[in-house]
């Protein structure tokens, strides 16, 4: 069996693949990204939808004041959706002008404007209209109304059609200001961004040879920009796997994004930031639970907007998620500080992030490690010496790690 190698501490340039745990997590992040081809397609679809709802004869002709991305699309934190490896949700806001006939009428107008749009299906939700594309992409378009002079500060409809038990109402919203706040707190970390984007584009078969951030050509934009956002994507992936079989509401992405923004500290390693974000949300939940309250997370730029207005609904809901996050952080800390078997790490990661994506990521890690050994660039050590695998368990021809016999305990901070 192969021990997870430790990092040789020296003056080598900091990069996301230098530490073995960071390297595996970086490969995981690459495998849950919106691929470059779909990223470009998402931008095209965004523009196409805008043109369609403003077309001559549309109920919204001349009424769309602005059209902008929100959520993960606005902060470059898109990942595959719950229970999938190749479906992606993207979010857009359409700010609507004109007579205010109520929240249900606002959704009615947007639904009518999107009638016959050429996608697999168009579905009306409680707060948005969702377009489902044949390739697995989902586009949520949320109508909003401006309620204050401040840019894009307003409200969105909450209207479940035909349901009297949940009256239609407007909900405060300023996702635009939140996105600006988040991006200001998570600046591009150049070395990290270039290393991961190069790997992402190469995996997609697209050349990426930028010398620095300023030289990145328009056709190869920096999809990955900061350690904070990559850790956020891994937190979201972890949540998606934890709730893959659940049918109810799950911890909202915008809540996790808000906590990530508060926890942001440029310059941290990926594993450290992932642990920091997991603990940040878990402890916020724990603090609320100790007071006998449900977690409340306001928009830092528009406090009347509550990112937790629909989740959690109970103490059980929030404490269950807190336990999931503590388990994740405990396991990562064990991997960073303990003598962890790589086979144990792989098995544990599958439980946290999903089988297929972990298998692909570990294979990529093995291949990268093999290339480094062959080119004498390997920087991992055990007890201070150069770590060179003696058996094919890490870099052998099969490149995947064989499972080991079950044990009563693992080194990952949990009982089997």
Curated annotation (Swiss-Prot):
Keyword terms of this UniProt record: Antiviral defense, ATP-binding, GTP-binding, Magnesium, Metal-binding, Nucleotide metabolism, Nucleotide-binding, Nucleotidyltransferase, Transferase
The organism's place on the tree of life at top rank: Bacteria
Spans traversing the lipid bilayer: none
UniProt-listed GO biological process terms: defense response to virus; nucleotide metabolic process
Manner of cofactor binding, per the entry note: Binds at least 1 Mg(2+) ion per subunit.
Chain positions of site Important for nucleotide discrimination: 70
Cofactor: Mg(2+)
Active site, renumbered: 89, 91, 140
Sequence positions that bind Mg(2+): 91
MF terms in GO: ATP binding; GTP binding; metal ion binding; nucleotidyltransferase activity
Reactions accelerated catalytically: UTP + GTP = 3',3'-cGMP-UMP + 2 diphosphate; GTP + ATP = 3',3'-cGAMP + 2 diphosphate; 2 ATP = 3',3'-c-di-AMP + 2 diphosphate
Binding-site positions, GTP: 72, 91, 236, 253, 305-306, 309
Family stated for the protein in its record: Belongs to the CD-NTase family. G10 subfamily.
Function comment: Cyclic nucleotide synthase (second messenger synthase) of a CBASS antivirus system. CBASS (cyclic oligonucleotide-based antiphage signaling system) provides immunity against bacteriophage. The CD-NTase protein synthesizes cyclic nucleotides in response to infection; these serve as specific second messenger signals. The signals activate a diverse range of effectors, leading to bacterial cell death and thus abortive phage infection. A type II-short CBASS system. Cyclic dinucleotide synthase that catalyzes the synthesis of predominantly 3'3'-cGMP-UMP, followed by 3'3'-cGAMP and c-di-AMP in a reaction mixture of ATP, CTP, GTP and UTP. The cyclic nucleotide products are second messengers that activate the CBASS Cap5 effector nuclease, leading to DNA degradation and probably cell death. Cyclic nucleotides do not activate the effector equally; reactions with ATP/GTP, ATP/UTP and ATP alone activate Cap5, whereas reaction with GTP/UTP (the major in vitro product) do not.
Protein name, UniProt field: Cyclic dinucleotide synthase CdnG
Organism expressing this protein natively: Bradyrhizobium diazoefficiens (strain JCM 10833 / BCRC 13528 / IAM 13628 / NBRC 14792 / USDA 110)
Gene giving rise to this polypeptide: cdnG
């Amino acid at each position: 069996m192969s021990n997870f190698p430790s990092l040789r501490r020296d003056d080598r340039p900091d990069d996301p693949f230098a530490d073995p745990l960071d390297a595996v997590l970086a490969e995981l992040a690459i495998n849950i990204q919106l691929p470059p081809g779909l990223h470009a397609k998402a931008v095209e679809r965004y523009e196409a939808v805008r043109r369609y709802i403003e077309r001559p004869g549309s109920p919204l002709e001349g009424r769309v004041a602005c059209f902008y991305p929100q959520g993960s699309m606005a902060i470059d934190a898109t990942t595959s959706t719950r229970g999938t490896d190749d479906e992606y949700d993207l979010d857009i806001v359409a700010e609507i002008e004109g007579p205010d006939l109520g929240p249900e009428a606002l959704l009615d107008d947007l639904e009518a404007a999107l009638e016959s749009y050429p996608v697999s299906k168009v579905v009306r939700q409680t707060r948005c209209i969702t377009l489902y594309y044949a390739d697995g992409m989902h586009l949520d378009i949320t109508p909003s109304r401006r309620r204050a002079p401040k840019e894009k500060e307003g409200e969105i409809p909450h209207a479940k059609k035909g349901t009297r038990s949940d009256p239609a109402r407007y909900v405060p919203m300023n996702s635009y200001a939140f996105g600006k706040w988040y991006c200001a707190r998570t600046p591009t970390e150049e070395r990290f961004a270039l290393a991961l984007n190069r790997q992402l584009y190469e995996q997609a078969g697209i050349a990426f040879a930028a010398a620095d951030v300023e030289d990145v050509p328009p056709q190869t934009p920096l999809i990955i920009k900061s350690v904070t956002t990559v850790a956020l994507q891994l937190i979201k992936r972890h949540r998606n796997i934890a709730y893959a079989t659940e049918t109810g509401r799950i911890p909202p992405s915008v809540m996790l994004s808000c906590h990530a923004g508060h926890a942001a500290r440029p310059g941290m390693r990926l594993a450290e930031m992932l642990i920091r974000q997991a603990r940040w949300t878990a402890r916020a939940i724990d603090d609320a639970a100790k007071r006998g309250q449900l977690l409340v997370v306001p928009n830092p730029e528009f406090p009347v907007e509550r990112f937790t207005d629909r989740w959690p609904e109970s103490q059980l809901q929030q404490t269950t998620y807190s336990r999931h996050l503590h388990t994740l952080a405990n396991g990562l800390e064990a991997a960073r500080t303990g003598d962890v078997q790589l086979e144990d790490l792989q098995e544990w990661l599958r439980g946290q992030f999903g089988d297929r994506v972990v298998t692909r990521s570990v294979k990529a890690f093995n291949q990268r490690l093999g290339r480094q050994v062959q080119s004498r660039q390997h920087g991992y050590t055990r007890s201070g010496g150069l770590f060179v695998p003696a058996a094919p368990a890490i870099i052998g021809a099969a490149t995947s790690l064989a499972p080991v016999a079950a044990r009563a305990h693992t080194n990952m901070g949990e009982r089997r």
